[in-house]
């Protein structure tokens, strides 16, 4: 597999090409990382190119590296979720790692590597979200770039959302008789194993 580096501005353009189609999306500021809102929830998003991890015994392993940045100090203190996406240009795929784990690892060393597998990046189809269970305990989600709006629509089903501000209600949000979101942690824990990702 050939890995080409894409500039930060181009990575922003690629994600915005899809997000700008959603009325739920609002771009606020920045390039990499950038601040956005989706359904009025603020997120910091940082996209890096995926490349080979150069493991001789696991040639199909890819990685995205999270560098040390001054701007990450403020993001780490922020109550906003920090989304780290690895981008595979050849397959037009994003890999997202657990944002709780990623945020904890911000600026802990010169660079922190997050891993994926090329086989999943090649096989994932549009509208599909594949969870990889890696040997290091990480369980990233792999999906097509064109599915980024669906990703944000379903973000609460992929990883636990740890809110740093108390919520007024834990009741499910209903619209037209359909449950649109569930925020009650105990119920979410029971439902997650039943949801096919």
What are these model-derived regions, one by one?
Residues 1-197:
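Intrinsically disordered, charged low-complexity linkers and terminal tails
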């Amino acid at each position: 597999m050939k890995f080409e580096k894409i500039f930060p501005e181009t990575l922003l353009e690629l994600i915005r090409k899809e997000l700008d189609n959603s009325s739920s999306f609002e771009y606020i500021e920045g390039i990499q990382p950038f601040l956005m809102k989706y359904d009025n929830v603020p997120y910091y998003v940082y996209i890096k190119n995926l490349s080979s991890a150069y493991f001789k015994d696991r040639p199909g392993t890819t990685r995205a590296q999270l560098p040390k940045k001054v701007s990450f100090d403020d993001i780490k203190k922020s109550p906003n979720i920090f989304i780290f996406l690895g981008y595979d240009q050849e397959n037009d795929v994003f890999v997202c790692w657990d944002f709780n784990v990623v945020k904890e690892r911000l600026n802990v060393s010169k660079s922190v590597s997050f891993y994926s597998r090329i086989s999943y990046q090649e096989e994932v189809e549009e509208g599909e979200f594949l969870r990889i269970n890696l040997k290091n305990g990480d369980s990233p989600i792999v999906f097509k770039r064109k599915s980024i709006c669906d990703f944000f629509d379903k973000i609460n089903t992929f990883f636990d959302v740890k809110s740093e501000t108390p919520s007024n209600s834990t009741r499910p949000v209903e619209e037209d008789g359909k449950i649109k979101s569930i925020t009650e942690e105990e119920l979410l824990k029971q439902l997650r194993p039943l949801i096919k990702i």
